[in-house]
Amino acid sequence: MLTSHTYTIRPSEIQDTRQLMDLDALVWDKNTSPAPFHWRSRQQYLQHCPPGSQLLAVQGDRVCGYVGFHPATAMPVNQHVYEINIAVHPYDRRCGIATALMDAMKQLAREQEIRKLRLRVLSCNPGAIAFYTQCGFLTEGRLVSEFYIDGKYVDDILMSYFIEA
């Protein structure tokens, strides 16, 4: 668990569910996701994001952001790879929370002997691309014109970070 002067980073817990669902509805829009994302139910959310599958940045009881992680596939030969996604509440952006979450994710990956973190980012989200690059992620692939959003074709960029043992 990491602590700064304003927030703590800890694993997600069942009581965080409503705030995490609300945060997803707030941050995943046409600039950050192929389609806005809204969970149909608490049960659906918990099936996809069980407690402990995210690291949260919290101020008191308020969730400021998260980084979610799960095995990239169910194949045993791919268990050294985590797929991740990160979200920070708009109110809490530009104060180091995303960087702290990413650092905590890298540390957790080392502890769990994960060797690679991967993520996907839309080409229409240059701020996120710059952030991931700053965090050491490399572009491994690009699915050109993968999505058609608001009358424009958008690429899906595949980025990865390799954990040093």
What residues fall within each predicted segment?
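Glycine-rich acetyl-CoA-binding "A-motif" of GNAT/NAT acetyltransferases
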Residues: R62-G65, G127, Y153
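Acetyl-CoA-dependent GNAT
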Residues: Y7, I14, L26-Y91, M102-D103, ...
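Conserved GNAT acetyl-CoA-binding A-motif
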Residues: A109-R120
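Hydrophobic pocket/interface hotspot
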Residues: L20, D24
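Short glycine/proline-centered loop/turn elements that form peptide/ligand docking sites
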Residues: M102, N125-A128, S145-D150
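Conserved catalytic-core motifs of GNAT/GCN5-like acyltransferases
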Residues: P71, R118-V121, T133, L138-V154
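Terminal substrate-recognition subdomain of acyl/acetyltransferases
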Residues: L2-T3, K152-A165
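Conserved acetyl-CoA-binding loop-helix of GNAT-fold acetyltransferases
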Residues: R94-Q107, A130-Q134
